Curated annotation (Swiss-Prot):
Protein name: Undecaprenyl-diphosphatase
Note: Bacitracin is thought to be involved in the inhibition of peptidoglycan synthesis by sequestering undecaprenyl diphosphate, thereby reducing the pool of lipid carrier available.
One Pfam family recorded for the sequence: BacA
One of the protein's GO biological processes: response to antibiotic
Recorded catalytic activity of this chain's protein: di-trans,octa-cis-undecaprenyl diphosphate + H2O = di-trans,octa-cis-undecaprenyl phosphate + phosphate + H(+)
Gene name per UniProt: uppP
Record localization: Cell membrane
Organism: Staphylococcus aureus (strain MRSA252)
Domain of life: Bacteria
Classification via NCBIfam families: PRK00281.1-4, undec_PP_bacA
GO molecular function terms listed in the Swiss-Prot or TrEMBL record: undecaprenyl-diphosphatase activity
Length: 291
């Protein structure tokens, strides 16, 4: 394994860690950074490169699980744990905590069902540069609409005030985000905001709901494709995983700290700029044709 290839693995892990849970579409960034630039399939082989992306995604998912470890233990009624960062002290004293396992399950159902039904179709027909650009752009517009609406909401709800109906609707939007480029977090956070949650609450629920789904999906994919991992490539996988996990920890904590302040529009603008950049490379220079 050449040093340059290990560096490429670290770069891809960093990109995955930065983008998996941000509302900017990790798929769009992987197409730009890997398929159009680093081309891991050329030195790993297409199947092994696909497996590598599963591994680094697991790195990001483990990072989110670690950030929300106390909340997950609390939902599962294991021990005594602190509140989710950002909840209001007076609200915690005046009413019992409402977020529970049923909220998470209700939110997971739509994406789980549609994932089982359409995963193969989506993987075969929708993972192209033009379809990802459409997802990036439409998702950006949806985020802008959500932010404009949220400005009119006087008392947005915290994550512990979420209802089962709100959880279900947010879950439906997670299913819609199966369209590559749309962004799971962009879709669900926007929907949560439209359902009168504050941005931090919508983000908290998005990540809490996404972790078990992504662990299951990535875990099953890895079980299907683990035989594609070559012994010589293991350092590549380890470095990519560690990069995704480490950067993911920093990115998720930073995002949750800032989201109530900066809202979604800056991410939407970034997505539109990204679409323009990818379009120039794809249509103007033919980079990425055949993906």
């Amino acid at each position: 394994m050449f040093i340059i290839e290990l560096i490429k693995g670290i770069i891809l892990g960093i990109v995955e860690g930065l983008t998996e849970f941000a509302p900017v579409s990790s798929t769009g960034h992987m197409i730009l950074v890997d398929d159009m630039w680093l081309k891991s399939s050329e030195f790993l082989g297409s199947q092994s490169a696909f497996t590598f992306k599963i591994v680094i995604q697991l790195g990001s998912v483990f990072a989110a699980a670690w950030v929300f470890r106390e909340r997950f233990l609390e939902i599962l009624h294991i021990g005594k744990h602190k509140h989710v960062e950002g909840d209001n002290n007076q609200q915690r004293r005046s009413k019992p905590r409402r977020l529970n396992l049923l909220h998470v399950l209700v939110g997971m159902v739509p994406a789980g069902i549609l994932g089982l039904l359409f995963d193969d179709f989506i993987e075969e027909h929708l993972f192209s540069v033009p379809t990802v650009m459409i997802g990036l752009f439409v998702g950006a517009i949806y985020m802008i609409i959500a932010d404009k609406y949220s400005a009119k909401v006087k008392n947005p709800q915290t994550v512990d005030q979420i209802s089962y109906f709100q959880a279900f609707v947010i879950g439906i939007s997670q299913a819609v985000a199966m369209w590559p480029g749309f962004s799971r977090s962009g879709s669900t956070i926007s929907t949560g905001v439209l359902m009168k949650l504050n941005h931090k609450a919508a983000s908290d629920f998005t990540f809490i709901m996404a972790v078990p789904i992504m662990l299951a999906a990535s875990g099953l994919s890895l079980l299907k494709h683990y035989q594609d991992i070559q012994i010589a490539d293991i350092p590549f996988y380890i470095l990519g995983f560690l990069a995704a996990f480490t950067v993911g920890l920093i990115a998720i904590k930073t995002f949750l700290h800032l989201i109530n302040k900066i809202k979604l529009i800056p991410f939407a603008i970034y997505r539109i700029v990204l679409v323009i950049f990818i379009a120039i490379l794809y249509f103007g220079f033919g980079i990425g044709k055949g993906i």
